[in-house]
């Protein structure tokens, strides 16, 4: 067992290109694995039941020190206890099912506009031309942010996720300071105006004990929603198109209405989770068999491994869109379950429907390029062609 697990290297070229290799090693090893190839070192949970239980125990597994491997004093939605509950109530109305359904027509319009731009191209890129701009535009509209410079916004989001996974997070701070300054300017502008229906206006004007959120927390909350609102969905769309085009006959079966789109989305989330895992921090010692994780230690909840746990999923290394997806854990569970999960699914549904209708002969040119940070799993490039 130890021989299998001792060569785990989440940042190796092999495991970055195929995270299922890491998942298999973890699932064949200890329930709690000590990973010392990162500074600071951390533990990894990989079993589905262990992760599910940990995510439902927010008093033991804390969010407030950041959900990456580095220790930070976090706030906004990445927080704990009553404060997290209050912050979540500020943003939740925009992500309830009723609000999400009202966005479907607008999503269809954005998607059609994006695909119109590439209609006459023989070759184009799923990421650059569709899966990146679609979620960025819609999250900007939800927040009330101008959409005139989405490439700059995408650069900020990329810097944020890179910082989250880096042993040298300070190298990304200069770029992120620009994002913070931009958001703070918008927040101050909204505070000087009557409150409107935008989410940024609600964030700017919300109060705790009759005081506005601090500038830092308002900016962090806005940044968290902005980054989460596009990174996950971008990879979900790209990953699913990639699998549909790379697995024999899967795209043709989809075009022929032999596969249900919701089943495909659920299975893509299981098989290719856009986030391979997030981190918690222990508030007390926690023991798994003969391994004790000390207090104040970072623990990675490895969603990618949990989604391939054979105790939960039959034949887990096979992409099967007919399986029951209710236990897929990619959006987390418990009080920190992803607020934008239904929006991400709807965006993917709209994108896939449009591709199927307009480009039934879609072909993969090559496998493109993987996103960089080890916690994330998606395509930063995915070139395709159509006749």
Residue ranges: model-predicted function:
Residues 1-387:
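Cytochrome P450
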């Amino acid at each position: 067992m130890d021989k299998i697990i001792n060569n785990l290297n989440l940042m190796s070229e092999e495991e970055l290109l195929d995270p299922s290799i890491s998942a298999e090693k973890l699932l064949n090893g200890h329930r709690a694995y000590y990973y010392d190839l990162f500074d600071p070192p951390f533990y990894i949970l990989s079993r589905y039941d262990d992760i599910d239980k940990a995510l439902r125990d927010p008093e033991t597994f804390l969010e407030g020190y950041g959900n990456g491997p580095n220790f930070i004093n976090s706030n906004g939605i990445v927080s704990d206890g009553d404060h997290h509950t209050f912050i979540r109530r500020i943003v939740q109305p925009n992500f309830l099912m009723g609000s999400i359904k009202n966005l479907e027509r607008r999503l269809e319009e954005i998607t059609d506009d994006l695909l119109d731009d590439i209609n006459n191209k023989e070759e184009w890129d799923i990421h650059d031309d569709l899966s990146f701009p679609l979620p960025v535009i819609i999250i900007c509209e939800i927040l009330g942010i101008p959409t005139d410079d989405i490439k700059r916004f995408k650069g900020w989001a990329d810097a944020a996720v890179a910082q989250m996974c880096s042993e040298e997070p300070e190298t990304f701070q200069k770029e992120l300071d620009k994002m913070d300054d931009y958001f703070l300017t918008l927040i101050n502008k909204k505070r000087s105006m009557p409150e409107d229906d935008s989410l940024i206006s609600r964030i700017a004007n919300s109060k705790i004990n009759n005081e506005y959120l601090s500038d830092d927390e308002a900016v962090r909350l806005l940044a968290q929603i902005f980054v989460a609102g596009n990174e996950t969905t971008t990879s979900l769309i790209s990953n699913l198109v990639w699998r549909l085009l790379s697995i024999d006959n899967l795209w043709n079966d989809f075009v022929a209405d032999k596969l249900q789109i919701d089943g495909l989305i659920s299975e893509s989330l299981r098989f290719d989770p856009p986030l391979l895992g997030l981190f918690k921090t222990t508030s007390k010692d926690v023991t798994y068999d003969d391994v004790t994780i000390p207090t104040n230690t970072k623990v990675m909840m490895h969603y990618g491994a949990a989604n391939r746990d054979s105790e939960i999923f039959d034949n887990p290394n096979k992409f099967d869109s007919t399986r029951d997806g209710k236990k897929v854990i990619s959006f987390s569970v418990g009080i920190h379950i992803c607020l934008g999960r239904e929006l991400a699914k709807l965006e993917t549904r709209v994108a896939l429907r449009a591709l199927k209708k307009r480009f039934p002969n879609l072909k993969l040119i090559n496998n493109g390029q993987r996103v960089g940070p080890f916690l994330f799993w998606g395509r930063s490039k995915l070139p395709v062609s159509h006749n």
